[in-house]
Amino acid sequence: MQVGIVARKGSERAVAVADELRDAVAGAGASVWLDAETADALGEPAAGREVDALADCDLAVAVGGDGTFLFVARNAGDTPIVGVNLGEVGFLNAVPPEAAEEAVVSEVEAFDRGEMNVREAPRLAARTDEWTSVPAANEVVIQGARRGPGAGIDYEVRVDGSRYAGGHADGVLVATPTGSTAYNLSEGGPLVHPAVSGLVVNEMVAEEGMPPIVVDADATVTVAVEGVDEVVVASDGRNVTTLPAPTEVTVERTTPPMRIAGPPSDFFAALEKLS
């Protein structure tokens, strides 16, 4: 079994936890490596690998916050991920540092027995006829090059071919249940429990918008954009592409889903940390 461990960048605590986990995993009989930046922080550059090697692992471990988990997910493909939470909200990272060794070693042992329990969470991709985005675990945002007065886009949103909304807005956001607690929430969208199979469609500061709606997880959401020379499409706020407009951007669920190992997080306990 091969395990890759990634620590939050710039966090001495995360690096220390990752180092302890490396020893514990090796002691359990698995092959284990650290990401290059964590290995450098420990003064062991030869022990590090690039994060895209996570896709070839049997288990990935993210040590930090939800941002670290999403960073790992972008590189892990369908490799299961265990998240160690260092005191942040922790919708994805369920394991506290004091329980990290036991939780990760337990997953190693479960893998050896062929009994690893993995949960799946949907990911989204945006596309046009000529382009496809990087998968997003939280949300895809389609917006103008600028937000605010005098900016934004003219748009029409269709769900499975039926018109849902249209007009002028800063943009349109499509979120997974995982992403409902992130950017979607700050844009006035609803919380969606992770057990719900659905997607959120949320207009961003629309002049005459519809309320946000939760649609089927397999729905196809199409956003037609005009009134601007270009449109910006962002996956999880980090992978940003500028496309010429007018255009149509289609957002739908993609494969592989995000695969999560280890104990599940308590959704409602995590919500309390938002207040």
Curated annotation (Swiss-Prot):
Q: What is its EC number?
A: 2.7.1.23
| GO BP | NAD metabolic process; NADP biosynthetic process
Q: Which SUPFAM superfamilies match?
A: NAD kinase/diacylglycerol kinase-like
Q: Return the Pfam families for the record.
A: NAD_kinase, NAD_kinase_C
Question: What does the record give as cofactor?
Answer: a divalent metal cation
Instruction: Quote the record's binding site residues for NAD(+).
Output: D66, G67, N138, E139, H168, D170, T181, A182, Y183, N184, L185, S186, V205
Q: What is this protein called?
A: NAD kinase
